[in-house]
Amino acid sequence: MVEELMKRFDVWLVMKEPNNSRVVDNLGLCTIVTPDELKDLPSILVAPMTTLSESLPSRIECHFDDAKGYIMVDQLRAIDKFCFIKKLGELESETQVKLCDCLQEFFAL
């Protein structure tokens, strides 16, 4: 079952809006930010990833799959589990720490 494989800091290819018929515009990379203890919920909290970004405190630079990109903490969203298509890997441990620090700052405001 897919949800058993889902863990915090995993990077997944997801369908962002299941009702959107434009498949190309609807797929994207996301990293899971939901704590593993809450993986039984029907949806998972994710932060989208992009290769294009402005310099914002809520954007974390990362390297994934030999490409430089950004995790967009300011674009958090809940995605239903059936929208997760394929696990692509996991964030590096240094990036995981930066993500946790950014989440703490983001919600402390």
Regions found by a protein language model. Name each.
Residues 1-109:
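Conserved functional hotspots at enzyme active or ligand-binding sites that engage polyanionic ligands
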